[in-house]
Amino acid sequence: MTDSTAGFSTRAIHAGQPFEESTGAVIPPLHLSTTYHPYSIGELRGGYDYSRGTNPTRDSLQQQLAALEGGRFGISYASGLGAEDAVLRGLLKPGDHVVMGNDVYGGTFRLISRIHGAVGIGHTPVDLTDVDAVRAAVAETGAKLLWIETPSNPMMRIADVEALVAVAHEAGAYALVDNTFASPYLQQPLALGADLVVHSTTKYLGGHSDVVGGAVITNSEEIDSAVRFIQFAAGNQSSPFDAYLTTRGAKTLAVRMDRHCDNAEAVASWLLGRSEVSHVLYPGLDDHPGHDVAARQMRRFGGMVSVRLKGGEAAARKVAESTRVFTLAESLGGVESLMNYPSEMTHASVKGTELAVPEDLLRLSVGLEDAEDLLSDLERAFEGL
């Protein structure tokens, strides 16, 4: 079922997932074949010839992803950065420019600045919460692409998607939203006017920390054609097994995200009461600078919480290495809670640059465990300071 009037969970469960005609299997089979026998030369069965180009299991995922974001086209990749690379190669050429947040994910910054910068793609980091500053940067650089990440990783800043889309379109630029932190359940950038959405499906969409993947979703046939060509020609597609795991995980996205949000709200409230804490960065808090914008463009406020400690780097490192329920690890969005020290882990590539993450900051991916156990775990770690 891909009917856009169906509810979110109905689409998550049924889009791209018809029962299998020959046996009646309710779950479509995993198609591992690399190649397909045509009816005759030039007459393909269902459009399938070689699995790098098309694969039934990958097609199921791509239809599901499009349905969840309210888009016409979904394209799945081997990783989130692979999806981002396909966008940059498909839509830009040497001499073009990207305006992005000054707290963008470190991997995105590395990809744009070092890989694509080496072939003539320029970039300008700017505070995306300052719409006038973004407008000035887009105008001064003649940017072809405005890269919006909201909530941002790991500073949890909220960008006004509708306002920034308007800035991009006034200048004739594409507006892209990285929706990884929010997930399609909490935020629908295409409905807010974005031209395309990117995801690391490794995170909330897959949801179980057992599959790496990425995606691009758009309503534009032009964008789809350009970016899908990179998937095929560069061989950066998701494998059938990875697509299968991602599809299975995404079916429960709504119920998981509600639990992530419940637990994150409890953790953020608990952190507010701790004397060791200088700042709690969570858009669900009334005093968060982006709270009103987040309330307008998001269903709820997400499962990610960042916290800064008065004891600086030493305190942050000690807490990160002292928890038992929160696991010290990179990544996010799985059912288990993760503790991350971005300055030396996920954002080590931007250390010493204008995008450096504060050394007193911890990023918490709040999972689905019992909230009482999460709070007890944090209390044990904080009592050790």
Q: Predicted segment positions?
A:
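N-terminal "arm"/small-domain region of PLP-dependent enzymes with the aminotransferase-like
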Residues: M1-N55, L61-Q64
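Conserved PLP-enzyme active-site core in the AAT-like
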Residues: T2-S4, F73-E276, L281
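C-terminal core of ALDH-fold dehydrogenases
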Residues: T5, A12-V26, A314-K351
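Conserved N-terminal alpha-helix of the aminotransferase class I/II PLP-enzyme fold
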Residues: T35-D85, G107-R114
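PLP-dependent enzyme catalytic core of the Aspartate aminotransferase-like
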Residues: S113, A136-A139, E321, S337-L385
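A common structural junction motif
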Residues: A234-G235, S322-S331, A381-L385
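Short, well-ordered beta-strand elements within core beta-sheets of diverse protein domains
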Residues: T246-V255, G302-K310, L362-G367
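Conserved small-domain helix->loop->beta segment predominantly found in fold-type I
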Residues: E265-R324, L328-E330, S349-A356
